[in-house]
A protein has these predicted regions:
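Active-site glycine-rich loops that stabilize anionic/oxyanionic intermediates
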Residues: 5-8, 84
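Conserved serine/cysteine hydrolase catalytic core
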Residues: 177-209
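Conserved alpha/beta-hydrolase
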Residues: 10-12, 17-43
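Alpha/beta-hydrolase fold nucleophile elbow
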Residues: 71-83
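Alpha/beta-hydrolase-fold enzymes
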Residues: 88-176
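Alpha/beta-hydrolase active-site loop
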Residues: 48-69
Length: 209
């Protein structure tokens, strides 16, 4: 089971899925709410917004219970979770520790890069914006999808992979996610605080890499 990252989608994982398939793994992947072909919750098609970070965990459990588990046929279940999906995956492992035998948390979102703004300031501002009813505003420096390529500031060193996915984004509006809301940031901070609590970490039974 794959849990993708912030502003990503299942479409971005085609190459990895093929690699897993070639090694005899069946693969299931969810588009997290607000991402890919899942419903939008932001002010436009590009914005990632969520009312409660725990909704991601509930969605994943529903996906597992309704789609994945009924097709397991006594096979073991493994998790590959990246970035934001890593935080979702870690919280899931803490709350529901009887699903996965093993898990890979790839660059999990255990902290948030707040850029030029100190983390404490970002926490205060995001909470303030939510309190005064402006939680659905874009984060500073975030905005609607830009149709001009920006490989230099992307999260990959592979130009070929960047161009491949960017071209898909241009062709498919549902892939054009590009920024978060203050609601999302505020909830992400809460989710990270929860997953890093020692008593919650102790609940994990799966082998984790």
């Amino acid at each position: 089971v794959i849990s993708h990252g912030f502003c990503e989608s299942s479409e971005k994982y085609r190459e990895l899925i093929k690699t897993f398939n070639k090694n005899n793994y069946s693969v299931y992947i969810i588009d997290h709410r607000g991402h890919g072909k899942s419903g939008r919750l932001g002010i436009d098609n590009s914005q990632i917004n969520v009312e409660d970070f725990n909704y991601y965990i509930k969605d994943l459990k529903t996906f597992l219970d309704s789609i994945v588990v009924p097709n397991l046929n006594d096979r073991k279940l493994y998790l590959f979770a990246h970035s934001m999906g890593g935080a979702i995956g870690a919280l899931f492992l803490e709350k529901h520790n009887n699903y996965f035998e093993k898990a890979i948390l790839n660059c999990p979102m255990m902290e948030i890069d707040t850029g030029k703004y100190p983390k404490i300031v970002s926490k205060i501002v995001s909470k303030l914006f939510c309190t005064i009813g402006m939680g659905n505003k874009y984060l500073f420096g975030h905005g609607p999808f830009n149709s001009k390529p920006d490989f230099i500031n992307s999260a990959t060193s592979s130009r070929k992979r960047y161009d491949s996915y960017f071209n898909k984004q241009l062709e498919h509006k549902e892939l054009q996610t590009s920024g978060g809301s203050f609601n999302w940031l505020n909830q992400a901070f809460k989710g990270i605080k929860e997953l890093l609590k020692e008593e919650n970490i102790q609940n994990i039974k799966a082998d984790v890499l």
